[in-house]
Curated annotation (Swiss-Prot):
Residue numbers spanned by region Spacer: 725-857
Keyword Nucleotide-binding attributed: no
Source organism per UniProt: Rattus norvegicus
InterPro entries in the cross-refs: ADAM_Cys-rich, ADAMTS/ADAMTS-like, ADAMTS_ADAMTS-like, ADAMTS_CR_2, ADAMTS_CR_3, ADAMTS_spacer1, MetalloPept_cat_dom_sf, Pept_M12B_ADAM-TS1
An example molecular function term from Gene Ontology annotations: zinc ion binding
Protein name: A disintegrin and metalloproteinase with thrombospondin motifs 1
Disulfide cysteine pairs (residue numbers): C333-C385, C362-C367, C379-C462, C417-C446, C488-C511, C499-C521, C506-C540, C534-C545, C571-C608, C575-C613, C586-C598
SUPFAM superfamilies in UniProt: Metalloproteases ('zincins'), catalytic domain (SSF55486), TSP-1 type 1 repeat (SSF82895)
Length: 967
């Protein structure tokens, strides 16, 4: 859980330094919805913090008369001119409401929708209000404005931020662009334009301690540990020997458009404070956040959209909101589930929910918390939620920041990020202390990497569906809607006004307040809202005062395109089958001005260095990785001075096979020592699939990814099963104690020993045991039993044991046995006569069959393929009599002639099995019934339907039914 901590009380300075102050009139409910939309539009430019120590910013303001006109030849382009601060600011604006879903709805809790519709949205549909663009043609500038009820919003130009809003006397009037036939309009409506420059002060973001110790089976594992492949293409040196074609996965490492369908919730404190302007205010905040997530520095195509806004008018009908931020988050996460449709096809289904409140939130130590969210929960319906404290337009920063946590981003100063960010400053959105936002790269390399890895590992599948009817987000800059005075009121209360300070124009908002009975200026070190006027023809954009005429240079979106593939990187292993990568960047060109990010494969990978590794005392590669942690395990378990780690396979979920789960030898505790094994590590002992970036991908027995080659029953890669023979037997015993059943020689493959208890009994007093060649016991020796399923690693061979308490006690192994083992049965008490069956396969001898050694001999060729894959087939081979020179002969003894045919594929074929009929779908009239259809192997395992004979597939597994005629 990530609590967000601001700067505390903010920074103060004597009022004598602030010059003449004009107190803004109260700006109430008719504007608040509009304000909320603008605030949302600015979220991507804000952070989750609110107080810091830093130098003051420069800030001043002027009264201006905005002039709007349609651009000639461009029906959708609107030109806004502002004369302020001794310059002309020309804004070239385009409608921009992409953050609103077409099917966006506004709902209320505690009042009827009909009675509140007009109160919440007196201006009707707000989607047409919002615009974005550039200032004075500067491609590095940015603007986000609303042109409804006057000009409101913010813009950024050349290091200065501008915020514009109607002067209080005209706050409820409406300013709209002229019709296309009219060249311009300039109604005599004064606006307050504020300009601000950001200082070097920082905003602090506190987090709970992030555990990175090994995670036990009873603990909760962190999801934000970095992966192993680099952000940039590595150098080709030591790349390893590539093997086979490049493996390009269908879903892994693919840049796909993601749509974050969002529900915005405002509690009663928000409704009381913002009144009818609440909806617009929320959407303004969200539109700013949406623009941040469109920035190419996030290295993904992520669109934030609103599908629903819910306003709570009766406190008791909403989630319990208290000063305890963590408890409020838990309450909200639990409460919001009732408002979400379980079907992703529902237009009102949302992927994440955000609660906005005016309640002062507190963390575990201070009340400087501005927001809270869990990490990496975006597709978890129960935990994909955030809580935001609304303290003004800067709440947009908090929203972008908290959504970053939901997308699995840690803070930039977390140790996970050290290898990515290096000596990183605090100028990115996920910084724990923000000094100044780098608008050219709002997301740090670590943030981009963490969200990319998170999505590549399948944690964002709920974001793949494009919303049907998103609500349009406002395009107006927030500073055009809310002047500096109003921004101060949002942050410090209704009595606060803007403190003019030429040194902090656009960069830091200073507001009046009282301290010790004295009138002072105070700040929370956030810039003026974009769009706040900072001079004649200028306004604030991204903390800088820019000319409005430069808007044209960055108003046109530039869509990104992929650059060339880079060189192949280093192989993850020096032998035994590793993985190497090549990457490409979305830099040809880099997307700009809200242009689309590249879609398609960003990473390719392939197998490399597949040669056998030198013998390492029979240890597997996973064993080596577990043992590498022995020297770091200083904690004692019981009386043991240190811990020896061995791989754990039994009981590990299939989705966790590529985590390094190791067991403390002789103790039984197991932990996830690493979130991912090294690329190329086999997923399990009985599979040739390998791990790639924490995911199990198919590979052949030749260690090549996507290869179809398999081991046959003889353990030969790509073989046909003709080089070995099956050895089996059944043993019974009645004497107490340990008794040998069979000694399985080295080289045996596909070993299976089964001990079935009598029907209705879980144990009959007899148990399997394994003894090594040196007489030591590997399993169930010295009358000590292992009751649970486990994996036994012996000389590089993994033996899987079911546990003595299983109804079918079983020992299995698939790889060739390195040393002989003796299978025993332990009889205790008055045990019933056990029935134990064993099977394994051994390589055939290849000596020639000689009839007359000195003159001629029978010469045989390899067995051909079996005529069937199951159900009893035949194999043939050529058997010829030849002399010592290899010529055909007839002197061979016929009585010793080897057989030229033999039966094969003696295992029963997979069979179809149908289940019982389901109840009729209707209680009367004509309905239908169905039954399950499965393809089963000879031992009862479920196979894919393709494994069974399609000609024998039952045809009637769905049928009509009539229980009774309807009356």
């Amino acid at each position: 859980m990530q609590p967000e901590v601001p700067l505390g009380s903010g920074k103060l300075k004597p009022c004598s330094d602030m010059g003449d102050i004009q107190r803004a009139a109260k700006f109430r409910s008719s504007q608040s919805a509009h304000m909320l939309l603008l605030l949302l539009a600015s979220i991507t430019m804000l952070l989750c913090v609110r107080g810091a120590h830093g130098r003051p910013t420069e800030e001043d303001e002027e009264l201006v008369l905005p002039s709007l006109e349609r651009a000639r030849g461009h029906d959708s382009t609107t030109l806004l001119r502002l004369d302020a601060f001794g310059q002309q600011l020309h804004l070239k604006l385009q409608p921009d409401s992409g953050f609103l879903a077409p099917g966006f709805t506004l709902q209320t809790v505690g009042r009827s929708p009909g009675s509140e519709a007009q109160h919440l949205d007196p201006t009707g549909d707000l989607a047409h209000c919002f615009y974005s663009g550039t200032v004075n043609g500067d491609p590095s500038s940015a603007a986000a404005l609303s042109l409804c009820e006057g000009v409101r919003g913010a813009f950024y130009l050349q290091g200065e931020e501008f915020f514009i809003q109607p002067a209080p006397a005209v706050a409820t009037e409406r300013l709209v662009p002229a019709e296309p036939k009219e060249e311009s309009i300039a109604p005599p409506r004064f606006h307050i334009l504020r300009r601000r420059r950001r200082g070097s002060g920082g905003a602090k973001c506190g987090v709970m301690d992030e555990e990175t110790l090994p995670t036990s089976n009873s603990g909760r594992e962190s999801q934000n540990t970095p992966d192993q492949w680099p952000l940039r293409n590595p150098t080709p040196q030591g790349a390893g020997k590539p093997t086979g074609p490049g493996s390009i996965r269908k879903k892994r490492f693919v840049s796909s458009p993601r749509y974050v369908e969002t529900m915005l919730v405002a509690d009663q404190s928000m409704a009381d404070f913002h009144g009818s302007g609440l909806k617009h205010y929320l959407l303004t905040l969200f539109s700013v956040a949406a623009r941040f997530y469109k920035h190419p520095s996030i290295r993904n195509s992520i669109s934030l959209v609103v599908v629903k806004i819910l306003v709570i008018y009766e406190e008791q009908k909403g989630p319990e909101v208290t000063s305890n931020a963590a408890l409020t988050l838990r309450n909200f996460c639990s409460w919001q589930k009732q408002h979400n449709s379980p079907s992703d096809r529902d237009p009102e289904h949302y992927d994440t929910a955000i609660l906005f409140t005016r309640q002062d939130l507190c963390g575990s130590h201070t009340c400087d918390t501005l927001g809270m969210a869990d990490v990496g929960t975006v597709c978890d319906p129960s935990r994909s939620c955030s809580v935001i404290e609304d303290d003004g337009l800067q709440a947009a920063f908090t929203t972008a920041h908290e959504l970053g946590h939901v997308f699995n981003m840690p803070h930039d100063d977390a140790k996970h990020c050290a290898s990515f960010n290096g000596v990183s400053g605090d100028s990115h959105l996920m910084a724990s202390m923000l000094s100044s936002l780098d608008h050219s790269q709002p997301w740090s390399p670590c943030s981009a990497y963490m969200v990319t890895s998170f999505l590549d590992n399948g944690h964002g599948e709920c974001l793949m569906d494009k919303p049907q009817n998103p609500i349009k987000l406002p395009s107006d800059l927030p500073g055009t809607l809310y002047d500096a005075n109003r921004q101060c009121q949002f942050t410090f209360g209704e009595e606060s006004t803007h403190c003019p300070d030429a040194a902090s124009t656009c960069s830091t908002l200073w507001c009046t307040g009282t301290s010790g009975g004295l009138l002072v200026c105070q700040t929370k070190h956030f810039p003026w809202a974009d769009g706040t006027s900072c001079g004649e023809g200028k306004w604030c954009v991204s903390g800088k005062c820019v000319n409005k005429t430069d808007m044209k240079h960055f108003a046109t979106p530039v869509h990104g395109s992929w650059g060339p593939w880079g060189p192949w990187g280093d192989c993850s292993r020096t032998c035994g089958g590793g993985v190497q990568y090549t990457m490409r960047e979305c830099d040809n060109p880099v997307p700009k001005n809200g242009g689309k990010y590249c879609e398609g494969k960003r990473v390719r990978y392939r197998s490399c260095n597949i040669e056998d590794c030198p013998d390492n005392n029979g240890k597997t590669f996973r064993e080596e990785q577990c043992e590498a942690h022995n020297e770091f395990s200083k904690a004692s378990f019981g009386n043991e001075p240190t811990v020896e780690w061995t791989p754990k396979y039994a009981g590990v979920s299939p989705k966790d096979r590529c985590k390094l789960t190791c067991e403390a030898k002789g103790i039984g505790y197991f932990f996830v020592l690493q979130p991912k094994v090294v690329d190329g590590t086999p997923c399990s002992p009985d599979s040739t699939s390998v791990c790639v970036q924490g995911q199990c991908v198919k590979a052949g027995c030749d260690r090549i990814i996507d290869s179809k080659k398999k081991f046959d029953k003889c353990g030969v890669c790509g073989g046909n099963g003709s080089t070995c023979k099956k050895i089996s037997g059944t043993v019974t015993s009645t004497r107490p104690g340990y008794h040998d059943i069979v000694t399985i020689p080295a080289g045996a493959t596909n070993i299976e020993v089964k001990h079935r208890n009598p029907r209705g009994s879980r144990n009959n007093g007899s148990f399997l045991a394994i003894r090594a060649a040196d007489g030591t016991y590997i399993l169930n020796g010295n009358f000590t039993l292992s009751t649970l399923e486990q994996d036994l690693t012996y000389k590089g061979t993994v033996l899987r044991y079911s546990g003595s308490s299983a109804a079918l006690e079983r020992i299995r192994s698939f790889s060739p046995l390195k040393e002989p083992l003796t299978i025993q049965v332990l009889m205790v008490g008055h045990a019933l006569r056990p029935k134990i069956k064993y099977t394994y396969f051994m390589k055939k001898k290849t000596e020639p069959f000689n009839a007359i050694p000195t003159f001629s001999e029978w010469v045989i060729e390899e067995w051909g393929e079996c005529s069937k894959t199951c159900g009893s087939g035949w194999q043939r081979r050529v058997v010829e009599c030849r002399d010592i020179n290899g010529h055909p002969a007839s002197e061979c003894a016929k009585e010793v002639k080897p057989a030229s045919t033999r039966p094969c594929a003696d295992l029963p074929c997979p069979r179809w099995q149908v289940g019982d009929w389901s109840p009729c779908s209707k209680t009367c009239g004509k309905g239908y019934k169905k039954r399950t259809l499965k393809c089963l192997s000879h031992d009862g395992g479920v196979l894919s339907n393709e494994s069974c004979d399609p000609l024998k597939k039952p045809k009637h597994y769905i049928d009509f039914c009539i229980l009774t005629q309807c009356s």
